[in-house]
Amino acid sequence: GKYAHLTFETANFRNYTPEGRDITNTYDSIVRNEWVLHGYYKYNCKPRNRMYLHVMYHAYMYATWYHTAYVVSTAEAILDPAKMRNPKSQGAAWGPSHEIGHMNQIRPGALWHGMTECTVNIPSEYITTYVFKQPSRLQEERMGDGNNRYSLAFSHIIAGETPFCSAGSTNSKDGVMQGVDVFKQLVPFWQLEL
C-alpha cells in the first residue's frame, strides 16, 4: 500500500483477503489516520517509509521501532477487512492499531515513564471509534462488576481523588507501580479528544 507493507503467509492472504486491495486500504487508513492524529502532516514530519507488518510464530503481537509482528493465529482476524472494519463490534483493528501506535509514539510528547501502554491506546481508540465507527471500548467493555471502563475510571480517579498516572495501581514495589489499569489511565486523555 501507500503507507503500509504487509508480509504474511500467501495461504492466509488467499483465505482471508480474496481482494488484496481491501486489506491494503484498511491498513493504509490506520497508518494515515494515526499520522494525522499525531500531527505528522500538520508539522510536515510524515515518515518517508511505510509501516511494516509481518507474520511471526513465537509471540502474540509486538512492535519494535521499525516493524510490527503478529502471530500466525491472528491472521484470520487481522487479514479480513470485514472483521477489521466491522462497525458493530470492536473488531480486530484494536491490536494492529495499538502496535502501529507504538511505532508512532511521539517522544517525549506522549511517551512518559509508566504511561507507554496507556498513551499508545489513544490512537487505538481513535482508529476504532472515529475511523472504523466501532463502539468505544471504554464505554462498551463491561468489567467484573458490570460497570464500563468510564465508570470505573470516574469512581477511581475523580471520586477517589487518585492521580490518573497511577490509576488502578494496587501497590508500589521498588518505585514501580504494579497492577496499573491502562484503560483507566486512558479515560482522561480520551476526554480531551471528545
Regions found by a protein language model. Give the residues of each.
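Catalytic cores of extracellular degradative/oxidative enzymes
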Residues: 2-193
